[in-house]
Amino acid sequence: MIYQSPTIQVELLEDNIAKLCFNAPGSVNKFDRETLASLDAALDSIKQDSNIKALVLTSSKDTFIVGADITEFLGLFAQDDAVLLSWVEQANAVFNKLEDLPFPTASAIKGFALGGGCETILATDFRIADTTAKIGLPETKLGIIPGFGGTVRLPRVIGADNALEWITTGKDQRAEDALKVGAVDSVVAPQALEAAAIQMLKDAVAEKLDWQARRNRKLSALTLPKLEAMMSFTTAKGMVFAVAGKHYPAPMAAVSVIEQASTKGRAEALQIEHQAFIKLAKTDVAKALIGIFLNDQFVKGKAKKAGKLAKEVNNAAVLGAGIMGGGIAYQSASKGTPIVMKDIAQPALDLGLNEAAKLLSAQVARGRSTPEKMAKVLNNITPSLDYAAIKHSDVVVEAVVEHPKIKAQVLAEVEGYVSEDAIIASNTSTISINLLAKSMKKPERFCGMHFFNPVHKMPLVEVIRGEHSSEETIASVVAYASKMGKTPIVVNDCPGFFVNRVLFPYFAGFNGLLAEGGDFAAIDKVMEKQFGWPMGPAYLLDVVGLDTGHHAQAVMAEGFPDRMGKSGTDAIDVMFENKRLGQKNGKGFYVYSVDSRGKPKKDVDPTSYGLLKDAFGELKAFEADDIIARTMIPMIIETVRCLEEGIVASPAEADMGLVYGLGFPPFRGGVFRYLDTMGVANFVALADKYAHLGGLYQVTDAMRTLAANNGSYYQA
């Protein structure tokens, strides 16, 4: 053994080829500080052994290296620039040491080689992947750029255009695609991987392959004619900005770094990367996006833990077909859990099956599935008009019409057809789980399971704990949601649960602006372009449906009359009473049609303005800051109330619920990250300016205390 540490082992193989194996404790290899220090020490040991003629890098895991240890990032990025620069330079010195070894090097890549893992393989002369490999630099998704030489080496290996696409999108690349652009030299079967890498090194040692020429190319400036370079980078800037926009600076910074470094050798090029990396690491956007990544890991970790208490779900059922039932059936079946789709009407079953078939056909058309897989998934969906079909179901999801009496009747019926230990969940967005539980003989095996529409696109599922729901029930539904590919958050029962409870105060702020003559299209523009929502409040209400919004608003008003009760008519009432239901009937705040390419199109409709003018008078302009404050303050305070009341368990789960359930702008990180970034005291001062607008603008006592103590919701 040449070198051994808890994360890396180096041994000498036949023909004096050294093998460096990444073997960290745990299921995957990460590039944390310990691994980086071990790699540095291992390379020193390798350099001192004069017998070594070549080096192969391998992994003992199913993956090569999944990337840096992101849990270290927020603490590290909070350090002074000088400390951060020192860390980046030390890390890069290790990668340079690997690249500068006096003999050929190769990486044998299986599974993921992402971020720092990808930058490791780029520092070797040859890269051999097996068919399971996925390679990429996802750093721009975290609001930063590669910091271990990725922006320098990748363009010199695969060309500027390809590197720009890889880095600015942050997408993983399959082994075959990596081979096409020259990121890897060969793709082999998993069992042949190490032998293929070693053979390539033998050929290099025997001078059949020119490893030094390959290395020199990475150490030099990019060989790109001036005009071609100018066109390439100008085009990239336009395309990247069109996708990333002004709120996500990292992709544009990556283009700029690659352009500036293109005429430099390695040392100068790395310095350009370092400076840009440090600048981005200090941004609020990086903190927000890294926070989302960590919150996602936290929520998934809780779901994994819940799996230990969960009843195994091998068969499921959904009651109520149609679009929602079909979406749930598709999601369950496509992730491997057979499901019965039960309804009382054949046309509804047909609609549900057609919905599943449509979603599967779209997957096949995009090349993400095959007709054989589609057939297998459809065979996992059993339509039935008879309750007898659900008797072996481990979990039954009730998804009938959103009406308390109908749901209660169906829930009482279904209990008589399933096993004693079957779990029943209601897919409801507004009806109290405790109320519905009254119709159950065994309320302990009942909870809420709120899917968001469209089911196949929306990643969030709210699992609602009733006062009688058992831990096994909650754990089982959380585990089933995870198995379906969803991100579950557990919330306690209250009107609107978590997501709708915090959404409707936002709509109330919007209604307040319109009642004073606000222009709904102007408000949407501010909330989309400046705050960063995917849809402004008027557009979102049209998508949700004004009938749905009208009903949910009434539920919220009844549940929280002191804050959400309303006197008189508001804009939602105006649209609903005039049968303007939104996208579903082609007219709401906006009017909807189909363009010449068959794509849905929305336009401002003078009729909407006329109706609102009749109700609220002439239009009045509001400043952008005023629009943002009046819509967001109620949502933020209600989110804080949910945390304080224990409706949601943590800031992390609340923020994930907002990002995944409502499309809260990821670059802001969620309400609690937004509050920490703004400063709780600054938010309290802002909210107090609007306190005269009513109960939704009243800051809680606990918030005031936190503000007075200069506290924050996250510890990092």
From Swiss-Prot:
GO terms for cellular component: fatty acid beta-oxidation multienzyme complex. This is Fatty acid oxidation complex subunit alpha. Its EC number is 4.2.1.17, 5.1.2.3, 5.3.3.8, 1.1.1.35. It catalyses: a (3S)-3-hydroxyacyl-CoA + NAD(+) = a 3-oxoacyl-CoA + NADH + H(+); a (3S)-3-hydroxyacyl-CoA = a (2E)-enoyl-CoA + H2O; a 4-saturated-(3S)-3-hydroxyacyl-CoA = a (3E)-enoyl-CoA + H2O; (3S)-3-hydroxybutanoyl-CoA = (3R)-3-hydroxybutanoyl-CoA. NAD(+) binds at M324, D343, V400, V401, E402, K407, S429, N453. NCBIfam families: FadB, PRK11730.1. In the N-terminal section; belongs to the enoyl-CoA hydratase/isomerase family. Substrate binds at D296, N500, Y660. Residues 1-189 are annotated as: Enoyl-CoA hydratase/isomerase. The active site is at H450. Pathway: Lipid metabolism; fatty acid beta-oxidation.
